[in-house]
Amino acid sequence: MEAWYMDDSADDQRKPHHRSPPEYVSLEKLAELGVLHWVLDADSFETDPELQRIRKERGYNYEDFIEVSPERLANYETKIKNFYEEHMHTDEEIRYCLDGSGYFDIRDPEDRWIRIWVKKGDMIVLPAGSYHRFTLDENNYLKAMRLFVGEPVWTPYNRPQDEHPVRKDYINNFLKTHLDKIDVSLSTQHAATA
């Protein structure tokens, strides 16, 4: 898995959208945003003990599969547009890439997009309340296992949702410390120039 800050171009969403020069984002930075990641053996997902361990520890007791491509997904154009609309969920979004590749974009505390490139074997968890979106890359294909705790619910809440209790929890748990540091830094700069 690789991640980087996106440029502001409105070009094809399937392009990498690197800044110039590229600004890569570490796994540690993603973890600060609540993003979890594992690299697993996608060819043996049915019997992989590591996947079973993760599922048991995190309570992922339901799975289904999705293939995202113009040929495989009914109402492809409508669905890919919906996936790319900035939104949040009240539950984690858990995806295990079994084949192909695609991008999950997530907002950082300063509201900048971070693009996360997932490929075969990558399992990613986006935290509940995080603003994010998904698109295929230029390969135009992804097969993923979707995991859920309990009954599968995939209800997107399009931005803005800042008053939603789950969004507030996400801000308090993952963004508040960073935002407080920015406020202190700005206050210090303002005091120094006054």
UniProtKB/Swiss-Prot annotation:
Binds either 1 Fe or Ni cation per monomer. Iron-binding promotes an acireductone dioxygenase reaction producing 2-keto-4-methylthiobutyrate, while nickel-binding promotes an acireductone dioxygenase reaction producing 3-(methylsulfanyl)propanoate. Pathway: Amino-acid biosynthesis; L-methionine biosynthesis via salvage pathway; L-methionine from S-methyl-5-thio-alpha-D-ribose 1-phosphate: step 5/6. One of its GO terms (molecular function) is iron ion binding. Keywords: Amino-acid biosynthesis, Cytoplasm, Dioxygenase, Iron, Metal-binding, Methionine biosynthesis, Nickel, Nucleus, Oxidoreductase. Fe(2+) binds at H87, H89, E93, H132. Its cofactor is Fe(2+); Ni(2+). Residues 1-21 are annotated as: Disordered. It catalyses: 1,2-dihydroxy-5-(methylsulfanyl)pent-1-en-3-one + O2 = 4-methylsulfanyl-2-oxobutanoate + formate + 2 H(+); 1,2-dihydroxy-5-(methylsulfanyl)pent-1-en-3-one + O2 = 3-(methylsulfanyl)propanoate + CO + formate + 2 H(+). Ni(2+) binds at H87, H89, E93, H132. The keyword Iron applies. The keyword Amino-acid biosynthesis applies. It is found in: Cytoplasm; Nucleus. This is Acireductone dioxygenase 1. The lineage of its organism: Eukaryota, Viridiplantae, Streptophyta, Embryophyta, Bryophyta.
